[in-house]
Swiss-Prot record:
Its EC number is 2.1.1.297. The gene is prmC. Belongs to the protein N5-glutamine methyltransferase family. PrmC subfamily. The lineage of its organism: Bacteria, Pseudomonadati, Chlamydiota, Chlamydiia, Chlamydiales. NCBIfam families: hemK_fam, RF_mod_PrmC. One of its GO terms (molecular function) is nucleic acid binding. This is Release factor glutamine methyltransferase. The keyword S-adenosyl-L-methionine applies. S-adenosyl-L-methionine binds at residues 140, 181. Methylates the class 1 translation termination release factors RF1/PrfA and RF2/PrfB on the glutamine residue of the universally conserved GGQ motif.
Amino acid sequence: MKKLLREASEYLLSRGIRFPQREAEDILMDLLEISSRSALHQAKLSSEEQSLYWKRLRKRGDRCPTAYIHGKVHFLGVELQVTPQVLIPRQETEIFVEQIIGYLQMHKEKTTFYDVCCGSGCIGLAVRKHCPHVRVTLSDISPEALAIAESNARSNALAVDFLLGDLFDPFSFPADVLVCNPPYLSYKEFFESDPEVRCHEPWKALVGGVSGLEFYHRIATHIHKILVSGGVGWLEIGSTQGEDIKQIFHAKGIRGRVLKDYAQLDRFFFLENQANDAVSSGEVSGFSER
């Protein structure tokens, strides 16, 4: 086993993988369904398992993200199928959604929740799991992504609604709470991104346009149609877009604030639709603001 892992690590290193030993172990642990690294070194592989292992290693060597190789991720107690038709849920998003769940549990009067540009459904399904009093609707423009989200809802026995369409178009009435992860990379940023992103994740879910801000202009223009008066929303944003997005919404008379992640990078934009105290009550711990 040590020889196999050493050869696997050396192969991944030769392909430019940043943490080759850890990833060689992770891929093997997933294949053998082993959760302990100490148990991994005692395992024995059949010739068929070795063949499957090297097949997965070659995929990773081609810079395919590990989550796509595994085919699933865990997100706040929800097991999610992930394929190249959907973005891979990020750890920053998971930490942030914990705070949104806390907000909804404190504000029981908020009973309708929209997850727009839902992808795998990670946000909406986690909200539904932990806030059963909330009616959750997930939407996406991609039929393939929505099919993955629907499959994830079924496999986790979570009752939610689904709508297919572009941004806010499929919704017929406003919600109390909105979360949206729109495409926000510029073309330049996309072509400069890591191969794992550029070559494998769905580019339509990543690229907003020439500036990367195009979807935020659309959201700011139509936010009053998608949120009730007093409603609140969170938008995922690019790491340097905070001030620009704040100005986009300010120009439409919408108050909001930028939330930074633990690395002090712009990560989310919190907004309110004419609520008198929503900004203060919507504070998200663990994220600084400006």
